[in-house]
Each structure stands twice: as structure tokens, then as C-alpha cells.
């Protein structure tokens, strides 16, 4: 209710409620680009888009928090983190998958996620309830993806029934996403979109390492590239944290 009151009073522009559509667009783009460029290249390219746009949204204060100057240290922190992901995925790159178009699309898709986080942060500053923000995000995202899915079913030979061919646990991703969006909507208001992005990258890499250790798939090996990437990621976090501390 507080969200729509803010829209009605013109404190919150209507278009900023489209955060969920940006996240849905990322998911849709991912399903098309990954088969072309591969998971590793898509991950690196989309992260590059996220970190670049995060510098801008923090600078203009789109998340509703304190505005941040695009300092050299913050740029270096972003570059270090992107480099860390490149190194962590180094042994999974397949150069035959290299496609300028696919990588460009992945960069754009990643930038949408950065803007989505900022918009969710701003929406949350009005709702004061992170799960209400998350609910709005998923309603708009689900509606948009459903629309795209219907269009695809009408104009291609892909059937919606194909969704049931995968394992049941793959549908848990959306449930986990509810908590992720709720948490990120609060966090970006305090630490900024860039620092949240850097920390979440570190978390994802650590999660990958834990899965490789405790739930390994056939042929899985603990990659020294992944471990190196984790250390470099948190070096980027430290660099960005020092930049934020120096402003105070």
C-alpha cells in the first residue's frame, strides 16, 4: 500500500516499478545467450555489465541511498572483481563459443540486473518491507516472463510442457530468489549497488567452491583458478570498502 501511495503522490515514478521486468529480461536473455557463448563467458560478460552500471547507479543515487563519486579506487575495485571472475572461470572457457554479439547481449543483460537492484532499493525505501518489495518484483517479473513464454509458444515450435522435463528441484530457484531480492533491496540502500555486487560475487564463488567440495559431480576437481578468483574478489571488496571509508 505504501508503494502505491508513493506512486500516487508522485514521489515514486511509475516506471520504477518495472524492476521485476528487468530481472525477467535477464533470465530470458540468459536462456538465449548461454547456449551460444557458454556459461563462463556469459557470467563474465554479465558481471562486467553489472559492475559498470553499479558505478553509475551509485553515482546518481538511484537506490535511494547516499550518492557515491566514481573514484579511481571504485573503478579499480570493479576491474579487480571482473578479473577475479575471469580467472575463476579460466579453465571453463571454450574459445570456439566466443561471439561478439552474444557477449554484447550478456553485458547489456548484466547492466539490467544492476539497475534492477537499485530500483528495488528505492522501492524498498517507500515500502519499508523487503518482502513486499520482493513480492512486487516477482509479480511483475513473472507476468512479463509469462507473456514472453506465450509469445514463444505461439510463434515457435517450443511447447510450455517442456518445462516439466527437468528435475523438480530446479523450480526451487525462484523461491530462493524471493529471499535474495528481499535482502538485496535492503542492503543496497546501505552499502550501495557496487559493493553489494562485489560481495555477492564473492558469495557465489564461495558457494561454487562448497558445492565442488561437498556435492561434487562426476569429474569435478577443485580448481586453483576458482580459489585465486575468490581471493581477488575480496581484494576488490576491500578496495571499494576503503574508498567508501575515505569519503567519510
What are these regions (language model features)?
Residues 40-49, 126, 130-140, 178-212:
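Helix-helix packing/entry segments at the starts of transmembrane helices
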Residues 17-28, 73-88, 106, 134-144, ...:
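Small-residue-rich segments of transmembrane alpha-helices in multi-pass membrane proteins
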Residues 25, 29, 73-79, 83, ...:
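Glycine-/small-residue-enriched transmembrane alpha-helix faces in small-molecule transporters
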Residues 1-18, 59-79, 93-98, 122-135, ...:
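Membrane-interface interhelical linkers
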Residues 85-92, 201-248:
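C-terminal-most transmembrane helix of multi-pass membrane proteins
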Residues 32-50, 55-76:
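Membrane-interface helix-loop-helix junctions at boundaries between adjacent transmembrane segments
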Residues 2-41, 46, 86-87, 175-191:
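Specific transmembrane alpha-helical segments of multi-pass solute transporters/efflux pumps
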Residues 34-52, 97-112, 161-177, 224-231:
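Structural signature of hydrophobic alpha-helical transmembrane segments
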Amino acid at each position: 500500500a505504501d508503494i502505491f501511495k508513493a506512486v500516487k503522490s508522485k514521489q515514486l515514478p511509475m516506471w520504477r516499478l518495472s524492476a521485476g521486468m528487468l530481472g525477467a529480461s535477464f533470465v530470458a536473455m540468459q536462456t538465449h545467450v548461454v547456449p551460444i557463448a557458454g556459461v563462463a563467458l556469459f557470467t563474465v560478460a554479465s558481471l562486467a555489465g553489472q559492475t559498470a552500471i553499479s558505478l553509475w547507479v551509485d553515482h546518481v543515487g538511484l537506490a535511494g541511498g547516499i550518492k557515491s563519486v566514481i573514484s579511481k579506487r571504485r573503478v579499480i575495485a570493479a576491474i579487480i572483481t571482473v578479473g577475479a571472475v575471469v580467472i575463476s572461470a579460466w579453465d571453463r572457457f571454450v574459445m570456439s563459443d566466443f561471439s561478439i554479439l552474444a557477449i554484447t547481449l550478456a553485458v547489456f543483460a548484466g547492466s539490467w540486473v544492476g539497475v534492477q537492484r537499485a530500483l528495488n532499493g528505492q522501492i524498498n525505501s517507500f515500502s519499508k518491507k523487503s518482502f513486499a518489495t520482493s513480492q512486487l518484483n516477482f509479480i511483475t517479473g513473472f507476468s512479463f516472463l509469462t507473456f514472453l513464454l506465450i509469445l514463444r509458444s505461439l510463434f515457435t515450435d517450443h511447447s510450455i510442457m517442456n518445462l516439466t522435463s527437468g528435475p523438480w528441484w530446479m523450480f526451487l530457484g525462484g523461491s530462493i530468489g524471493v529471499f535474495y531480492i528481499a535482502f538485496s533491496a535492503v542492503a543496497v540502500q546501505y552499502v550501495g549497488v557496487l559493493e553489494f555486487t562485489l560481495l555477492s560475487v564473492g558469495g557465489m564463488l564461495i558457494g561454487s567452491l562448497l558445492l565442488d567440495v561437498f556435492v561434487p559431480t562426476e569429474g569435478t576437481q577443485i580448481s586453483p583458478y576458482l580459489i585465486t578468483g575468490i581471493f581477488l574478489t575480496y581484494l576488490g571488496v576491500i578496495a571499494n570498502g576503503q574508498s567508501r571509508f575515505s569519503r567519510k
